[in-house]
Swiss-Prot record:
Stated name of the protein: Isoleucine--tRNA ligase
Species of the source: Shewanella baltica (strain OS195)
Function field: Catalyzes the attachment of isoleucine to tRNA(Ile). As IleRS can inadvertently accommodate and process structurally similar amino acids such as valine, to avoid such errors it has two additional distinct tRNA(Ile)-dependent editing activities. One activity is designated as 'pretransfer' editing and involves the hydrolysis of activated Val-AMP. The other activity is designated 'posttransfer' editing and involves deacylation of mischarged Val-tRNA(Ile).
Alphabetic keyword roster: Aminoacyl-tRNA synthetase, ATP-binding, Cytoplasm, Ligase, Metal-binding, Nucleotide-binding, Protein biosynthesis, Zinc
An MF annotation (GO) of this entry: ATP binding
PANTHER family: ISOLEUCINE--TRNA LIGASE, MITOCHONDRIAL (PTHR42765:SF1), SOLEUCYL-TRNA SYNTHETASE (PTHR42765)
Protein residues bound to ATP: 608
Domain notes: IleRS has two distinct active sites: one for aminoacylation and one for editing. The misactivated valine is translocated from the active site to the editing site, which sterically excludes the correctly activated isoleucine. The single editing site contains two valyl binding pockets, one specific for each substrate (Val-AMP or Val-tRNA(Ile)).
Gene3D superfamilies: 1.10.730.20, HUPs
């Protein structure tokens, strides 16, 4: 064999079998950075149609987690695939840099502003801390293979962005959407600040649930409304609440106007009294009050009690009964304790009736000094004291511990309160913002489509947006308010532009350093500067304007796509929609795509306490970023995304199949020069033309899946192609031709040409997902080429050519099925030790007329398809008793060990081996390939 070994075309490549990704990827990243890869991509797309994916900014605090990785990888896949489709698709990453979490971190280090450090110095410390966090997160994102303008990202704390945020606010004001009001807002007593809807999480909490009696100021008159005359016992309305601490702020009792209410009399502890309860809740209420027998004295609609007065249970005033649409009979008594300073519904109905918006609670959650009974007590600690006082006043009918879902601060994880404070709001209904936003939602494509109904419900129900915060580190609300009238300065918009110009040069500190007289002159004494800062959701929500509209690489093009986790319907998607609609009357995006949260193999959230956290840094250091990227792409992101060590190991297995395919392709392109060796598709061997045709069809399916953001379909189709059409069929069949045919002959060059075309296409298919591996493949592909695959477009060399004489795709599919059946029988013969390898086998196929016609069409080349030394086709009726039935009714098989000698070069067993004098150990085909013009292949 030593004489003939060098006549074989053995595969050879520098592409290693093992990826060693954890070590090799950082080396590639260095080259990408050194070569300015991102700028090369930008230069390659000058003048092309833009596609703008706007990066929702992660918060600049802490290390990135697996959810961050999912988000950034999905964005990167889209950017790279859009670039492959010819778009100019810049990616400018961003960070959200203001707000409380950073303040808290800096406070731990230097103390609170105004104590050991000035507010100005505190802001500078916050800026430094945020910059450090950005640098750490940036390195982790780059390690994932995400390409972008990492050296010039947008930060909401950039002076230019801060200035543009102020300009965005001025446009909202100019459009008439801003107003100031005393309204109940979510308030965190730990933060000492209002919270946005998106900063509120709901967790279970145990609260005291109490039923409280409000005795009528005139019981006889109230009883009369039920048709009971001259009633002599006390009549009370009963409320049910889980926030006893709000009772000092009670200013009314709300009833539903069309609901039926009963007057129920009973005796307890020797005292006769009558209670007013919703008719449908009488039984459940009296059970709670341990009332064994009662009499219903009458019934009346809620509307009958409008403005009837009832005594507060422990304060020296009475309150009216009022009517509200928010009253339900889901729980409680059908009568709602109404404190306009502590609830949104309460506030709305209170405005209708002109009720006082009482707020006896300070910023820190402690009752103010003038609060009767409870001054100086924290509201949650005061609950027990309120209950005790009600019991003392004989107003408490029931008291139990009640477990329910309750709003918590997303940062402190502590319960929050509703508290009326003077704040700045974007009105949802003045100038039709809510209505227009709902119209814009309809014009936007939501992926998955359930996102539309989700955000619609949120917009329909959301209150006015409180955009002011009482914080130090944030973009200031740069307004001047008249000290007497509380009205905005009439030139607010132009003044804000002048302030924005200063911020552009000096940052937000310019506002606090500003002497009002510099802008207002003699008017300065009439006005005061607003010291509130903007909700950070306004910062990020205005970046479509403050960043996208401002940066040159976006060419003034609107945003095509927002892509974030599903929690952002109420977060960034919402804030961006509101600001854009308020500013421009339209949504800031055309498409909105959401992905699910990551959970472990048991469906649980990632939690340090559970110990199921999978850090992306650990994955890249152990398996490599391409494995993580493949997991992201292969997972249907429309629901929860399950990840575990086992799942990532499965991704690594899938990766190896793709890598092995790429290695086979490269190894068999050794010595192939496309410029001189490429065989035209129409001149190829039929099997080669078929596989190119299959690849061309697959490419269209892959491109379509990329365009629809169905990356799991891309990976499914890629794996199917690598495993079935290539791995189990085509690549197996061509090995013989590739290794043994004449090196320069048509049979081999046809095969190599097909492999080359597939390689050129496949390296592009995988580039958006397996970016590092694609680059590795690209560097080793033969032929002249640009430095990087990422500047390319989808390969145009895949021609779907079908000649008149060609065999159909169905034919090759049938042949694949037959081959699988043959393999089963050969495998059994191998287990029975009747043969060794498949080339020791002679197979006889007993087939019906239709299948016989197909199998004999390719003549002697059938044996190459079946990987046997001989293949005979005989009529099914002639099947011998030893013939094995197959899953095809039209086919039976007999496998026998060949009696012919084995060719030393190709290992086929052929009758002529030993008959050729010059080459006694070779078959005729090998002699032709060594000394002649090379064998001729038509089909396989």
């Amino acid at each position: 064999m030593s004489d003939y070994k060098f006549t074989l075309n053995l595969p050879e490549t520098e592409f290693p079998m093992r990826g060693n990704l954890a070590n090799r990827e950082p080396e590639m990243l260095e080259r990408w950075t050194k070569d300015g890869l991102y700028q090369q991509i930008r230069d390659s797309r000058i003048g092309r149609t833009p596609f703008i994916l706007h990066d929702g900014p992660p918060y600049a605090n802490g290390s990135i987690h697996i959810g961050h990785s999912v988000n950034k990888i999905l964005k990167d896949i889209i950017i790279k695939s859009k670039t492959m489709s010819g778009f100019d698709a810049p990616y400018v990453p961003g960070w959200d840099c203001h707000g409380l979490p950073i303040e808290l971190k800096v406070e731990q280090k230097v103390g609170k502003p105004g104590q050991k450090i000035s507010a100005a110095e505190f802001r500078e410390e916050c800026r430094k801390y945020a910059a450090e966090q950005v640098n750490g997160q940036r390195e982790d994102f780059i390690r994932l293979g995400v390409l972008g303008d990492w050296q010039n990202p947008y930060l909401t704390m950039d002076f230019s962005t801060e200035a543009n945020i102020v300009r965005s606010l001025s446009k909202v004001i100019e459009s008439g959407h801003l107003h100031k009001g005393v309204k109940p807002v979510h308030w965190c007593t730990d933060c000492g600040s209002a919270l946005a809807e998106a900063e509120v999480e709901y967790e279970d909490k145990t609260s005291p649930a109490i039923d409280v009696a409000f005795v009528a100021a005139d019981s006889k008159a109230v009883a009369a409304k039920f048709g009971v005359s001259d009633y002599s016992h006390p009549v009370s309305m009963v409320i049910w609440t889980t926030t006893p601490w709000t009772l000092p702020a009670n200013r009314a009792l709300s009833l539903s106007p069309e609901l039926d209410y009963s007057l129920v009399e009973f005796e307890k502890d020797g005292v006769t009294q009558a209670l007013i309860l919703a008719e449908v809740l009488v039984e459940s209420c009296l059970t709670r009050y341990n009332v064994e027998s009662h009499t219903v004295l009458g019934s009346a609609k809620g509307a009958a009690f409008e403005l009837v007065r009832f005594n507060h249970p422990f304060l020296d005033f009475d309150v009216p009964a009022i009517l509200g649409d928010h009253v339900t009979t889901d729980a409680g008594t059908g009568i709602v304790h109404t404190a306009p300073g502590h609830g949104q519904d309460d506030f709305v109905v209170g405005q209708k009736y002109g009720l006082e918006v009482a707020n006896p609670v300070g910023d820190n959650g402690v009752y103010k000094p003038d609060t009767e009974y409870f001054a100086g007590q924290h509201v949650f600690k005061a609950n027990d004291n309120v209950v005790a006082l009600l019991r003392e006043k004989s107003a408490l009918l029931n008291h139990v511990a009640y477990r329910h879902s309750y709003p918590h601060c997303w940062r402190h994880k502590t319960p929050i309160i509703f508290r009326a404070t003077p704040q700045w709001f974007i009105s949802m209904d003045n100038h039709g913002l809510r209505t227009q936003a709902l119209k814009e939602i309809e014009q936007t494509q939501w992926i998955p489509d359930w996102g539309q109904s989700r955000i619609e419900k949120m917009v329909e129900n959301r209150p006015d947006w409180c955009i002011s915060r009482q914080r130090t580190w944030g973009v200031p609300i740069t307004l001047f308010v008249n000290r007497e009238t509380e009205e905005l300065h009439p030139d607010s918009v132009s003044l804000m532009e002048r302030v924005a110009c200063r911020i552009e040069q000096q940052g937000i500190q310019a506002w606090w350093d500003l002497d009002a007289a510099e802008l207002l002159g003699d008017e300065a004494e009439q006005y005061r500067k607003v010291t509130d800062t903007l909700d950070v959701w306004f910062d990020s929500g205005s970046t479509f304007s403050s960043v996208v509209a401002a940066r040159p690489e976006f060419h003034g093009h609107g945003v095509d796509l927002y892509l974030e986790g599903s929690d952002q319907h109420r977060g960034w998607f919402m804030s961006s929609l509101m600001i854009s609609t308020a500013m421009n009357g339209k949504a800031p995006y055309k498409q909105v795509l959401t992905h699910g949260f990551t959970v472990d193999g048991k469906g649980r959230k990632m939690s340090k306490s559970i110990g199921n956290v999978i850090a992306p840094q650990t994955v890249t250091n152990k398996l490599g970023a391409d494995i993580l990227r493949l997991w992201v792409a292969a997972t249907d992101y429309s629901g929860e995304m399950t990840v575990s060590d086992e799942i990532l190991n499965r991704s690594a297995d899938a990766y190896r199949r793709i890598r092995n395919t790429a290695r086979f392709l490269l190894a068999n392109l050794n010595g192939f020069e496309p410029a001189k060796d490429l065989v035209a598709v129409e001149d190829m061997v039929a099997l080669d033309r078929w596989v190119v045709r299959r690849a061309a069809a697959l490419q269209q399916e892959i491109i379509e899946a990329y365009e629809q953001y169905n990356f799991h379909i891309v990976t499914q189709k890629l794996m199917q192609f690598c495993s079935v059409e290539l791995g189990s069929f085509y690549l197996d069949i061509i090995k013989d031709r590739q290794y043994t045919a004449k090196q320069e002959g048509h049979a081999r060059r046809s095969c190599q040409s097909a492999l080359y075309l597939i390689s050129e296409a496949m390296v592009r298919w995988i580039a958006p997902i397996l970016s590092f591996t694609a680059d590795e493949v690209w560097q080793l592909l033969p032929g002249e080429r640009d430095a990087y695959v990422f500047t390319q477009e989808w390969y145009q060399g895949l021609k779907s050519v079908t000649l008149a004489t060609d065999l159909s795709d169905d034919y090759w599919q049938q042949l694949l099925t037959v081959r699988n059946e043959v393999n089963k029988v050969i495998e059994q013969a191998r287990r029975d030790k009747r043969i060794g390898g498949s080339l020791e086998a002679e197979v006889t196929l007993f087939a019906d007329a239709a299948l016989t016609e197909q199998l004999t069409h390719i003549g002697d080349e059938l044996r190459f398809v079946l990987l046997t030394s001989e293949a005979k086709v005989l009529p099914l009726a002639d099947a011998t008793s030893e013939a094995v039935e197959t899953e095809l009714a039209s086919l039976k098989l007999v496998v026998a060990s060949s009696t012919a000698e084995k060719c030393e070069r190709c290992w086929h067993h052929r009758e002529e081996v030993g008959t050729i004098e010059a080459h006694p150990t070779l078959c005729t085909r090998c002699v032709t390939n060594i000394e002649g013009d090379g064998e001729v292949r038509l089909f396989a």
